[in-house]
Curated annotation (Swiss-Prot):
Belongs to the eukaryotic ribosomal protein eS24 family. One of its GO terms (cellular component) is ribosome. This is Small ribosomal subunit protein eS24. The keyword Phosphoprotein does not apply. The keyword Chloroplast does not apply. Keywords: Ribonucleoprotein, Ribosomal protein. GO terms for molecular function: structural constituent of ribosome. The gene is rps24e. It comes from the Archaea.
Length: 102
């Protein structure tokens, strides 16, 4: 799976970078988590700082175009992102961490 960054837009007010990227894959469309891990490795970031919002694969193509938000640290991601996006990306919210520890 090869990831090419198409566009990066800085958003300093929300402490993040909006990234549009293209994934070329050999098999079926890769999972959101595998794309997140690969994108994080490409950008030299921690996987919890990357939130994949959209993956779009055209029928019959081996190319997926996606949109992600890359935060400066995981705390900003938890503060800004909606709960369902955190769940999709397997990022644990603050309240859930305390519940799991108990």
């Amino acid at each position: 799976m090869d990831i090419d960054i198409i566009e990066e837009d800085e958003n300093p007010m929300l402490h993040r970078t909006d990234v549009r990227f293209e994934v070329v894959h050999d098999e079926a469309t890769p999972s959101r988590l595998s794309v997140r891990d690969s994108l994080a490795a490409t950008l030299n970031k921690d996987a919890e700082e990357v939130v994949i919002h959209k993956l779009d694969t055209k029928f019959g193509m081996r190319k997926t175009v996606g949109y992600a938000k890359v935060y400066d640290n995981p705390e900003y991601a938890r503060d800004v992102e909606q709960d369902h996006m955190l769940e999709r990306n397997k990022i644990v919210a603050d309240g859930e961490e305390e519940a799991e520890e108990a």
